[in-house]
Amino acid sequence: MDKLRIKGGKSLAGSVDISGAKNAALPELCAALLTAETVTLQNVPGLQDVATMLKLIRNMGVEAERSAHAPGTVILNAGPLSSPEAPYELVKTMRASVLALGPLLARFGEATVSLPGGCAIGSRPVDQHIKGLQAMGADIIVEHGYMLARLPKGQTRLKGAAITTDMVTVTGTENFLMAATLAEGETILENAAQEPEIGDLAEMLIKMGAKIEGHGSRRIRIQGVERLHGCTHQVVADRIETGTFLCAVAAAGGDVVLNHGRADHLEVVIEKLREAGATVTAGEGFIRIQASGRMKAQSFRTTEYPGFPTDMQAQFMALNAIAQGTSTVTETIFENRFMHVNEMVRLGAKIQIEGKVCVINGVEQLSGATVMATDLRASASLVIAGLVASGETFVERIYHLDRGYDQMEAKLRGIGADIERMKA
């Protein structure tokens, strides 16, 4: 098992190429299941979750190859698909596997998808996926840890429906969006998620021949078509990777350009960084951040897009930990999203948890120690903390990091960080 060694105290300078978004690439790989024609995806990040999704759809019989000539390009053909099943062995490490449910049901009329590992119906919105697809005419039962979905006897297509979810669900919106493209009639999604990755998925589906309006709003309208065709599509840049590097530079100090970064997808985070004291400028296909000295602590509350993203909460907390002043961070999206706090405290941070709120008293200096990553974004926050801590910091269990960041330590090293991957 690998770990990272970080020697803190170096400012950052240069440029970083932002990779394609994991949270767009995963549903877009599943969207290839909707057609028998070839789909080419460009700017696909080299992540563990992407590798798992490729393994999952290959297991179904999909031909999926990374191009030898074009890095980041994946060529997919679901024509020879033989088994509309997502087994537990391949699903247990990745919740996004539920995204195969809608496309399989829409194109093949059946799907058997394992419940994601550790997922209790009700605590995560898997029940919303089931309700929505049932509204479109699917018969779905949950037994032995699997969702078994079928079209009723004599029915060859899902039926368009009005679907209103009980809460905003990103993967639910994506599942219904994909399923509705091949449904009979019109589907209207109310209370839809507005994340840029959903807009990117919709743009890909439109290239495939889907009829979609309203993506990027709370109400999406889809007119079903009989078949979709292949397409070539470039995965949108990863706004969370972008935000992570912005926080790293704000914390460590420096002057860095993030190529392919989309400021319009990170407006709330960028505004907070400016209020903290960083200079952030942006243009077509880049964001530049300049920072020096201690930032000013910023309070925030996570909400659905376009609010402050829960996936940026831990990274910004690392910045607040060494900022001037006291801040509060309120987490409204997920439970158990403060698992990084105890590890940051080991580095010298002064943070108290009060229910869904963290109170952070900024300190002048963190000190290096051995810490353990507990999840994807927590691991990124510990890397940021390590960049500013005195002495050496070792971050263990970085397989979490590899799930969502494409060569993070190499990119940081390229802008001046003293960081290396080691065998634990």
Curated annotation (Swiss-Prot):
Q: What's the protein name? A: UDP-N-acetylglucosamine 1-carboxyvinyltransferase
Cellular component GO terms held in the UniProt record: cytoplasm
Q: Which family does it belong to?
A: Belongs to the EPSP synthase family. MurA subfamily.
Give the UniProt subcellular location, in the record's own words: Cytoplasm
InterPro entries referenced in this protein's UniProt entry, alphabetically? Enolpyruvate_Tfrase_dom, Enolpyruvate_Tfrase_sf, MurA_subfamily, RNA3'P_cycl/enolpyr_Trfase_a/b, UDP_GlcNAc_COvinyl_MurA
Please give the function described in this protein's UniProt entry. Cell wall formation. Adds enolpyruvyl to UDP-N-acetylglucosamine.
Which residues carry out catalysis?
A: 119 (proton donor)
BP-aspect Gene Ontology terms: cell division; cell wall organization; peptidoglycan biosynthetic process; regulation of cell shape; UDP-N-acetylgalactosamine biosynthetic process
What organism is listed for this UniProt entry?
Polaromonas naphthalenivorans (strain CJ2)
Residues annotated for phosphoenolpyruvate binding in this entry:
22-23
Residues with 2-(S-cysteinyl)pyruvic acid O-phosphothioketal modification: 119
Name any one GO molecular function.
UDP-N-acetylglucosamine 1-carboxyvinyltransferase activity
Catalyses which reaction(s): phosphoenolpyruvate + UDP-N-acetyl-alpha-D-glucosamine = UDP-N-acetyl-3-O-(1-carboxyvinyl)-alpha-D-glucosamine + phosphate
CDD domains the record matches? UdpNAET (cd01555)
Stretches that traverse the bilayer: none
Entry-linked NCBIfam families: murA (TIGR01072), PRK09369.1 (NF006873)
Stated EC number for the protein is 2.5.1.7
Please tell me whether the keyword Cell division is annotated for this protein. yes
Q: Which domain of life is it from?
A: Bacteria
Which residues does the annotation say bind UDP-N-acetyl-alpha-D-glucosamine?
95, 124-128, 311, 333
Which pathway or pathways does this protein act in?
Cell wall biogenesis; peptidoglycan biosynthesis
Give the keywords, sorted: Cell cycle, Cell division, Cell shape, Cell wall biogenesis/degradation, Cytoplasm, Peptidoglycan synthesis, Pyruvate, Transferase
